[in-house]
Amino acid sequence: MATGKVLRRAVKAAAAGMIHYSGMRRAMAAYRRSQSGGRRILIVSYHRVVSDFTGELQRSIPGLLISQETFRRHLEEAHAAGFELASIGDAVDVMNGRRVAKKDLCVVTFDDGYRDVYRYAYPVLKEMGVPAITYLPTAFISTDKRFNHDRLFHLLRRVQERRFRPLYDSLPAPALQLLGPILSGQKTVSASLDDFIGEHPTRVLTEIIDALEQQLGGGADLVPEQGDIMNWDEVRRMARDGFEFGAHTLGHTVLTLEPQEVVEREILESKRAIEREVGITVRDFAYCNGWYSDEVIRVLSANGFRSGVTTEDLPNRIGGDPFTLKRKVLWENFSLGMLGDYSSALTGCQLDDCFGVLGMSSPVPGKRPHFISAPTVGNQLSSAPVRVSPKPATSNEIVLGPETATTIQEAP
């Protein structure tokens, strides 16, 4: 597994060097600009900006992390690549034809409201005069709570460290899907967790966390110290300096796995909380896990939102749908060269989407049919999803079921 990653990194770094120094990068950027309707609109997404990447890597989900130094260099690279660092509103206006951009646009976004963003990203953005928007799951703001993905990552690492063998009979049924590949060595904790979270609603994740904590014997060491979230005073301070905030549900909820009443509550109460606490109008939304559906978009459109951002790594096009904005999710290793150090050539090629032009990337679709999980049966939860929308799946839809991204098992 590690050898394959190193080989892929080496191939990509070598290709980036050739593209960058041969002048092909400029031609590819021009091609993407033409494809996008005359202006590129790049939206980049970050989660946690940290002071010590290597140290934090030992206890946190790697793909959420970027060092403050690398983050600063990304902003410098975007500027050097000819992008105007703009707001989400500017991007929507250009896409809708209400504004003509003189340059390509790059929008900086943050998901989840981690306190690291306030500590380490905010000072850099302020110093460089770069606008940004942070999407907040409001039930976590000004609390000591941690996200389910951070709690699960922490617990799974404890399971590994203790060489603990869980009692599956007393765990919710879907736990085997999460733990099996990790304990067998087929997947890393991060990879298994990433696959699992997108397939199961919040209540399943919470039940697995509670059951694992009980089996591991409880104790303070089962709750991660890292991953703390901003408080409202910090949010207000950033807002006073012109930084924007959008809604990201109440409880970091993957909405395509929830019934309609939950979707509406998660969206509207998140929006209202920010407006009440910060005194701003909230018009922008980020889909948790990057997943959205027609049903979710209808709720946003009917309630004063102007945009929704996905995690689909694809070009945004002039005239495109502002509720399916594409984003490039970035972290530290996004810029890692062949020798494991920062590569300006690789970063520039990534920002210019050279690998997308060459067909070397495989974007994950964010549009999903709208499902909820089957109800609890006894003390066991079925992981088979139930379609909310009555229409059958089409060839363009990605239908998720247990342990597969292409098939569906209907609940009885």
Name what the model sees in each region.
Residues 47, 248, 252:
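Histidine-centered divalent metal-coordination motifs
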Residues 120-124, 234, 295-299:
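A short acidic, amphipathic alpha-helical/loop segment
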Residues 114-115, 251, 255:
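Short, glycine/acidic-enriched loop or turn micro-motifs at the edges of active sites
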Residues 2-109, 116, 144-166, 174, ...:
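C-terminal active-site subregion of NodB/CE4 polysaccharide deacetylases
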Residues 35-41, 45, 145-241:
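Extended, charge-rich helix/loop segments that form flexible
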Residues 101-102, 114, 122-135, 176, ...:
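CE4/NodB-like, metal-dependent polysaccharide N-deacetylase domain
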Residues 138-141:
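Short beta-alpha junction loops
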